Amino acid sequence: MPRYKLVIEYDGAPFRGWQRQADDPTVQAAIETAVTRFSGETARLTCAGRTDAGVHAIHQVAHLDLAKDWRTDTVRDALNAHLRPQPVSILSAEVVPQEFDARHSAIRRHYRYRILNRRSPAALTRAHVWQVPWPLDAELMHRAAQRLLGHHDFSAFRAAECQAKSPMRTLEQLDVTRERMGLFEEIVIATSARSFLHHQVRAMAGTLMLAGCKRLSADDVAEILATGAKHRCGPLAPACGLTFVGVDYL
């Protein structure tokens, strides 16, 4: 029974997240249905990062086992044919050892959060950015972000319904940059860790936004982290601005 590794891109807007649910459309359900339609088999996918409703991905990784030894290009093309017109694309498929697990073999996950920082409304990217119309200082946001790096208790940036056994996480990267293209300006938050708590990236993005408009200092952000003062955090940034951009394996 060969194991296939899939690299997947999707627009999260029409889905209730990755994980299969009883009545709502999800990315996992869409792909598993496509698998059944092309192969006649019932397969269960395991992914590297179970994204929430509205969160996008440009390099999600998942694995599944099939009874038949299909050509990898056939798997890719057949799945894409059965996924249309849903905004999900299988970028590649490859056979991997049975020991490979898309979730548990991962050593690092990468996310990007996009903030459109202008007053004029977004026409083309509104489903993929958080629009903040007041001025933000990306340098102040970056300075505050550096206070969150390292191994810490991230309880202040954790969803109430988070099921992780421990709030301890090691944040390896949290960079904030401003990207300009004419009148189009975005603030991009790039972050990496082995794993994240539920809502951690969005909670950090909302808090860094307050640092960008000088409502919180870098010291304030460090104190929020140290004390777990969730009530002092910024708003939970909307899901639409978040994209899963990659995963590393040994």
Swiss-Prot record:
EC top class named in words: isomerase
Enumerate the GO terms in the molecular function aspect. RNA binding; tRNA pseudouridine(38-40) synthase activity
Q: Name one Pfam family in it.
A: PseudoU_synth_1
UniProt keywords, alphabetically: Isomerase, tRNA processing
GO BP term, example:
tRNA pseudouridine synthesis
EC number(s) on record? 5.4.99.12
- Residue ranges crossing the lipid bilayer per the database entry: none
Disulfide-bond pairs as recorded = none
* Catalysed reactions, semicolon-separated: uridine(38/39/40) in tRNA = pseudouridine(38/39/40) in tRNA
Which residues are responsible for catalysis? 52
Instruction: Name the residues that bind substrate.
Output: 111
Described purpose of this protein according to its UniProt entry: Formation of pseudouridine at positions 38, 39 and 40 in the anticodon stem and loop of transfer RNAs.
Q: How does it assemble?
A: Homodimer.
The similarity comment for this entry is: Belongs to the tRNA pseudouridine synthase TruA family.
Task: Output this protein's name.
Answer: tRNA pseudouridine synthase A
Organism, by scientific name, is: Methylorubrum extorquens (strain CM4 / NCIMB 13688) (Methylobacterium extorquens)
Q: What is the lineage of its organism?
A: Bacteria, Pseudomonadati, Pseudomonadota, Alphaproteobacteria, Hyphomicrobiales
User: Which gene is annotated as encoding this protein in its UniProt record?
Assistant: truA
